[in-house]
């Protein structure tokens, strides 16, 4: 029985790539800077001491980081026995965004340039805004700018509740984000608005990767909170991913846990499981692993590393999240069967010590574990698509156009 379990620790980069200068990210290092802060006692809020990730270390995380950066992460064990195969991978895609990283992991790098809304104020074309107001029968809109998702709620959340005007905002990513109150505006109405925005962006040729619904609750600035009912409307990958090939060619199954299905626009997904928060995502993953049959991929995105701690530049929160994940990792490893493979990886970096609030261009870890996986270094990988090609070889699908088998 062949099964693959893919765990994406969203934004968990392990050191700047060779082309990081193109992105202003030279010196970024999500793992390294978290470990450094922990070792200095600068991340003791809700946790304490050096970064403690013994299980990820045994799978080769510290070695992969050393390969990427040339140094051992502060306070971590560079001499631990390694029981998995490990690598550090460079992104071939032109961006450092979520769809690009995930699609490339599945064997389809993004070699075109996304469209972006680059102006920090009055970010969106008036023609687009007018169409949204007319089609959705809106009283107007708020925002129309670049912003952090939590900051803009404090700035405009109360006005949104009074006026019913949705909050439109973007970032350095190829995104159009819409924040609305779940109760006063309504979740269904928000989703309908996002569908309209997706249509207009596609028809208008803006080439925007995602429209993101950002529902929130609360009653005043300071206590607004985004909920777990986020919904991403992505464009479809430009070519069949290894997920699609497994389903189409082998009549296999792909189980999405978390936001995976949204990222792939449901292409190649046979089952969707929603969960919010690190523990809930982990619990849902364990349940699906226990139930998974032959020719199945269980694919989970642990979004909190990115959304809750990376973008918010919360080093202590990120460290605590990693330590929680590591404590629970043995539960997951115990479910890996004789012919199974477990792959732990990321989709980009989001260094919580870095300036700004955006992603960072970094190598990602590729940690592969299974009874038949030979432990040791798989070296520097030129593309995330090596993961997709490895899965294609493992399941016996037709080969991907990009990437090399690692096993």
From Swiss-Prot:
EC code(s) of this entry: 5.4.2.7
Pathway per the UniProt entry: Carbohydrate degradation; 2-deoxy-D-ribose 1-phosphate degradation; D-glyceraldehyde 3-phosphate and acetaldehyde from 2-deoxy-alpha-D-ribose 1-phosphate: step 1/2
Keywords: Cytoplasm, Isomerase, Manganese, Metal-binding
Residues involved in Mn(2+) 1 binding: 10, 347-348
InterPro entries, A to Z: Alkaline_phosphatase_core_sf, DeoB, Metalloenzyme, Phosphopentomutase_DeoB_cap_sf
A Pfam family annotated for this UniProt entry: Metalloenzyme
Co-factor binding comment: Binds 2 manganese ions.
Molecular function in Gene Ontology: magnesium ion binding; manganese ion binding; phosphopentomutase activity
GO biological-process terms attached to the record: 2-deoxyribose 1-phosphate catabolic process; 5-phosphoribose 1-diphosphate biosynthetic process; metabolic compound salvage; nucleotide metabolic process
Entry GO terms, CC: cytosol
Span of the signal peptide: none
Function: Isomerase that catalyzes the conversion of deoxy-ribose 1-phosphate (dRib-1-P) and ribose 1-phosphate (Rib-1-P) to deoxy-ribose 5-phosphate (dRib-5-P) and ribose 5-phosphate (Rib-5-P), respectively.
Protein family: Belongs to the phosphopentomutase family.
Name of the protein described by the UniProt record: Phosphopentomutase
């Amino acid at each position: 029985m062949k099964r693959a379990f893919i765990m994406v620790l969203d934004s968990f980069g392990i050191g700047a790539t060779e082309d990081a200068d193109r992105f202003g990210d030279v010196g970024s290092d999500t793992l390294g800077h978290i470990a450094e802060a922990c070792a200095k006692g600068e991340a003791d809020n809700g946790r304490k001491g050096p970064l403690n990730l013994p299980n990820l270390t045994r799978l080769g995380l510290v070695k992969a980081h050393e390969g990427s950066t040339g140094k051992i992460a502060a306070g971590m064990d560079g001499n631990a026995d390694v029981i998995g195969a490990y690598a550090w991978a460079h992104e071939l895609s032109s961006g450092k965004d979520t769809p690009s990283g995930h699609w490339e992991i599945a064997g389809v790098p993004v070699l075109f340039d996304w469209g972006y809304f680059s102006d920090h104020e009055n970010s969106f074309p008036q023609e687009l805004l007018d169409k949204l107001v007319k089609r959705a029968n809106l009283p107007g809109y708020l925002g129309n700018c670049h912003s952090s998702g939590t900051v803009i709620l404090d700035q405009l959340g109360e006005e949104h509740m009074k006026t019913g005007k949705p909050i439109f905002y973007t970032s350095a990513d190829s995104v159009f984000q819409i924040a609305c109150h779940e109760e006063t505006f309504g979740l269904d109405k928000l989703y309908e608005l996002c569908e309209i925005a997706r249509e207009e962006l596609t028809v208008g040729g803006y080439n925007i990767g995602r429209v993101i619904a950002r529902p929130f609750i609360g009653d005043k600035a300071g206590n607004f909170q985004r909920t777990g009912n986020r919904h991403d409307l992505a464009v479809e990958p430009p070519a069949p991913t290894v997920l699609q090939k497994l389903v189409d060619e082998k009549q296999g199954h792909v189980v999405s846990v978390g936001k995976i299905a949204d990222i792939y626009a449901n292409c190649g997904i046979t089952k969707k499981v929603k969960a919010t928060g690190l523990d809930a995502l982990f619990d849902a993953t364990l349940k699906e692993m226990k139930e998974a049959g032959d020719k199945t991929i269980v694919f989970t995105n642990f979004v909190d590393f990115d959304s809750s701690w990376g973008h918010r530049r919360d080093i202590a929160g990120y460290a605590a999240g990693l330590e929680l994940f590591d404590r629970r990792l043995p539960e997951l490893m115990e479910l890996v069967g004789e012919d199974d493979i477990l792959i732990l990886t990321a989709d980009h970096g989001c260094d919580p010590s870095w300036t700004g609030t955006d992603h960072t261009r970094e190598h990602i870890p590729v940690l592969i574990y299974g009874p038949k996986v030979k432990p040791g270094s798989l070296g520097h990988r030129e593309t995330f698509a090596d993961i997709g090609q490895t899965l294609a070889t493992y399941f016996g699908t037709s080969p991907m156009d990009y990437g090399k088998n690692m096993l």
